[in-house]
Amino acid sequence: MPPKPDPSSSGEAPQAMQPAPPPRAEGHMYAQPEGPGQNEEAMLEQRLIRLIELMATKRHNSTLSNISFEIGRPSLEPTPEMRRNPENPYSRFSIDELFKMEIRSVSNNMANTEQMAQITADIAGLGVPTEHVAGVILKVVIMCASVSSSVYLDPAGTVEFPTGAVPLDSIIAIMKNRAGLRKVCRLYAPVVWNYMLVQNRPPSDWQAMGFQWNARFAAFDTFDYVTNGAAIQPVEGLIRRPTPEETIAHNAHKSMAIDKSNRNERLANTNVEYTGGMLGAEIVRNHRNAINQ
C-alpha cells in the first residue's frame, strides 16, 4: 500500500483556523456598563432614599420634659466591701434596698383581716347573701358617721340590700363583739370621707356639735383616720385631704367629748360611798390660754 503524501511537503500552504466570534450580548445581564456620571446619580439617589427613611424614623408627636425615670432603672451592683452582710444586724441598708422592701401598713387601732373575716361570716350567717355583705358593712359605717361609733350606741332601723333587709342591732352587735364598732369604722374612714364629699352630705349633727360650716365634714368620730395608710383606700385615692381648719375643729370637739365622758374616770370607785350618787366633777380646761405668749 503506498504511503500517503505529507501535506507539509507539498507546495500548498495549510489553511489557517478562523477565530471564534465573540458571544452576543443578551438582555441586561450582558449590558454595557454605564458611564461614571450615571453611577454617581444612582448612588446619590440611594443616599437620598436612605436619608428620607432615617428622617421618617425620627418623627414623633410628643416631646418629653422634666425627665425622671427612677422606677425601673438598672440596679447598681455595690462593690464587695460595700455589700451588706445579711447575718450582721448592724450592717447598713442602702436606699435601693429600702426602696425594694414591701412592708404593709398596720394599725392596732382598727379592725384587722381576721376580725373582718369573722364579721363577714357572722353577717352572712344571718341570711345576708355573701355578695351583699360588704355593702351592708359600708352602709352601717356611713350611718355611724352621723350618729356615733360609741360602744354605748343603741341603733334603730334596718340596713337594706337588693334582696332584703337586716336589723341594725344585729350588724352592730356583731361588729362590737368581734372587733369593736369604732375599730371597724376607722378601717373605712377614707371611704366614708370620699362618700361624704361626693354626695355633699356631711354628718347630720355637725351644727349641733358646734362645728362651723367650713369644717362640717370633720364632725364624725373617725375623722382622724382619714389619712391612715392602714385603712381601706378608695380606688382613686382621697378626693382631697382634710384642711387644717377641719383638723383643729375635730380635735377641739374630740377633747371636749373625751373630758365629758371621762368625768367618772377620776373616781377610784363608783360606789355610792365615793360618788354620793352623783357624776364626777366636770373637767374644766381653759383653751383660751393655749395661744397666750
UniProtKB/Swiss-Prot annotation:
Name of a matching Pfam family: Flexi_CP_N
Signal peptide segment: none
GO molecular function: structural molecule activity
Cellular component per GO, a single term: ribonucleoprotein complex
Keywords of this entry: Capsid protein, Helical capsid protein, Ribonucleoprotein, Virion
Ribonucleoprotein recorded as keyword: yes
Compartment(s) of residence: Virion
Positions of the UniProt region annotated as Disordered: 1-39
Xref: InterPro entries: Carlavirus_coat_N (IPR013569), Pltvir_coat (IPR000052)
UniProt keyword Ribonucleoprotein present: yes
Function: Required for genome encapsidation. Forms ribonucleoprotein complexes along with TGB1 helicase and viral RNA.
More info: The N- and the C-terminus of this capsid protein may be exposed on the surface of the virus particle. The central core sequence may be important in maintaining correct tertiary structure of the capsid protein and/or play a role in interacting with the viral RNA.
Protein family: Belongs to the potexviruses coat protein family.
Protein name: Capsid protein
Organism: Potato virus S (strain Peruvian)
